Amino acid sequence: MKMGSSNNNPFKDQTNYSFTNKLFPYTLYALLPIAIIHLYLNPFSFSFSPTDLFPYTNRITISPSKEVLRKSIGLETSCDYSNGTWVQDNLGPLYNGTTCDTIKNGQNCMVYGRPDKDYLNWRWKPKNCKLPRFNPNSFLKLVKNKHIAFVGDSLARNQLESLLCMMGTISKPQLLYTDGEANKNRKWHIPSHNINVSIYWSPFLVKGIEKNTEKDFNTLYLDSVDEKWAKDLEFIDFLVLSVGHWYLHPAVYHNGNNVVLGCHYCQNYTEIGFYDVFGKALETTFRKIVERKGQNGNESSVFLTTFSPAHFEGEWDKFGACSKTQPYKEKVLEGMDAEMRKVGVEEVRKAKLRVEEFGNSNLRLEALDISGLALLRADGHPGPYMNPFPFANGVGERVQNDCVHWCLPGPIDTWNEILLDVLKRWGGEYKGKLT
């Protein structure tokens, strides 16, 4: 199918997938519409056929690593945030599309005319512990005089903007810097608590060259971290990493002395998929973090937000591609979504072992395991409301849909509720309390 480019695309800097409910071995490369991804990213076309190299099924009750807390805090258990349900909550969000000016236009669903509001009235309830509503004052106190940075792709930016909006209900962030390139790299300051907040565009975390008009594939150097963000590690106290979707793109992989390891969906190279590559990139990233953070001795917290599933239920440019208005009550995390989550959680586990070997008690790592709870929220995407009032003149033949990013406010606010709760547990706030 011949595809063109669009200037109003949610995927200019983010890729996604739509696929069947059940993936079988060696079918992922044959079934999923990469044209959806590349329509927004490049004016060229092709068909694609990713292979599910590691087919298996995980349910949303999967448990992440249990070692959230340092032993020195005196707590032996932590909250399994991945195991729970979405429950109705009529309190609604802390902010809206008019009170927060950092929301990217394509995710400002309320202002862009989304008529239903039920998607705003749900809270995540873990099965065996409490997840409090986000308290901006608590978060501001915890990160006072610190630098918090988000590094990754446009879903990292999505989560960052959610956090800025919630903090902004108490103290408005002041924009200090933007590189002008679609706001990919920005920095804010919150004077009331002397907090710096940054976003670094780095869709691979490792060194990479993004595809362009001359090359229709990415080039990744898996043994080298992306210094655009890593050079500032010594100045970052709280680091949130969020990547994954860009690994679904065609790419050539290099490792050490420019040796080509293989490729994902490109000609004249050995096809090696992207799961192992994703793991290798995370391994390189965490190793560099442990090495550099171990040198300065400052207390630091590092989080990896696990893979966030897309919810395309049809062609990206057709009416109803993601038209759900209620969360799923139950859904299985499987196929690519499950494998990408598994890789992320495993690399965090391995990184924790390196921290122990390194003897750096000031460095804490955790996976924000949101994949399962995000899977249930097909109702939380902008869909056609990535554009303002898309049906003002009726339903057209083409209706652009964003079924990857999240409305703000929306389900992604929960990612930051979990972030705050982990920080509170690490800080010993729940010591001696029933949680």
Predicted stretch roles:
Residues K2-T435:
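A compositional signature for long Ser/Thr(±Pro)-rich, low-complexity
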